[in-house]
Amino acid sequence: MSDFNTLRWLHGQPQGQGRLKVSPTDFQVVEDLGFAPDGDGEHLLVRIRKTGCNTRAVADALAKFLGIAAREVSFAGQKDKYAVTEQWLCARLPGKEMPAMRAFTLEGCEVLEFARHRRKLRLGALKGNRFSLVLRDITHRDEIEQRLSLISEKGVPNYFGPQRFGRGGSNIYQAKRWAQTGQPPRERNKRGFALSAARSLMFNTLVSERLQRFGVNQVMDGDALQLAGRGSWFVTTPEELTDLQARVDSGELLITAALPGSGDWGTQRAALAFEQATLADETELLTLLTREKVEAARRAMLLFPRELRWQWQDDATLEVSFWLPAGSFATSVIRELFNTADDVSDISE
């Protein structure tokens, strides 16, 4: 099964080199929930800017400040520690007065705003993230300029980034050990990380193999197609292939790949046969996902960064910004620009 660094590129392997995070200010992320606080309710939403802090540590510090259990503070997603990030935390405070949030202090953190809300903020309940990056020590400027234009027009493979798999692939190691021995990781969150990593790696393998053999825009009989920007999908039939191919070429529809698990994968006929053959050697992980009742799903094979903008500070330093939907990875965009020796396994999605 493919390592992230050996997955196929949509625009060919880059020739250039570059560095992704020389300092925290080079990697800035602003969370986009997609909704505003209600203004009333038993929950408190707090928007925080943090540098050099991981999300869980900030949540625990907020719980301590508010005098509540750590489990009463939630967030929509983990954000990178070695970066400047803005995100919302949610604290359940039924029947309590509005706390003096400006008095909350934690090194590297700043409270930006806060308001009451009616519902708990759950993991994954965000629209997306806006990234502002400074890329340094870049070579092959002309090639990277061309690649930025290609990415803007044609997107990138929607790979799960290496951070999904843990440092040194630790989450995948846990999943394979679990599959082989039947012994799950002791901690609940590590079990979740292992299962997520297993099917994410298989998704990456499907996309890379499809890209190599057919291209990610070639519609097959039985493909599961998704309306761009939507989560629902439908299955192609032989009679519709010509019309659906035109809609894929125009960007109206996206071809999906399986997030394997229990139940129907969604594809049929030729597309299903391709997915099954590609993952034929992964019976242990597939059995694990089925046994643990991880429901199969679909994910678009292509990712289109929105509002992609860039500006050169000098010939070797590039500022680039873009918006990605929840669950997408900035590292999967950057890998289409240049090669990097930086360890990006700790960059949160």
Curated annotation (Swiss-Prot):
Which family is it part of?
Answer: Belongs to the pseudouridine synthase TruD family.
Q: Which reaction does it catalyse?
A: uridine(13) in tRNA = pseudouridine(13) in tRNA
Q: Where is the active site?
A: D80 (nucleophile)
Start and end of every TRUD domain? 155-303
Q: Which domain of life is it from?
A: Bacteria
Question: Mind telling me which PANTHER family this protein's record contains?
Answer: TRNA PSEUDOURIDINE SYNTHASE D
Top-level enzyme category: isomerase
Looking at the UniProt entry, the stretches that span the membrane are: none
This protein's record includes keyword 4Fe-4S: no
What Gene3D superfamilies does UniProt report for this protein, alphabetically?
A: TruD, catalytic domain, TruD, insertion domain
A GO cellular component entry from the record: cytosol
Q: What SUPFAM superfamilies does the database record attribute to this sequence?
A: Pseudouridine synthase (SSF55120)
Recorded coiled-coil stretches: none
Functional description taken from the UniProt entry: Responsible for synthesis of pseudouridine from uracil-13 in transfer RNAs.
- The protein depicted here goes by the name tRNA pseudouridine synthase D
- Classification via CDD domains: PseudoU_synth_EcTruD
Question: What organism is recorded for this protein?
Answer: Cronobacter sakazakii (strain ATCC BAA-894)
One of the record's GO molecular function terms: RNA binding
Q: Where does substrate bind?
A: F27, N129, F329
| Biological-process GO terms, alphabetical | tRNA pseudouridine synthesis
Listed A to Z, the keywords are:
Isomerase, tRNA processing
Q: Which gene encodes it?
A: truD
Enzyme Commission number(s): 5.4.99.27
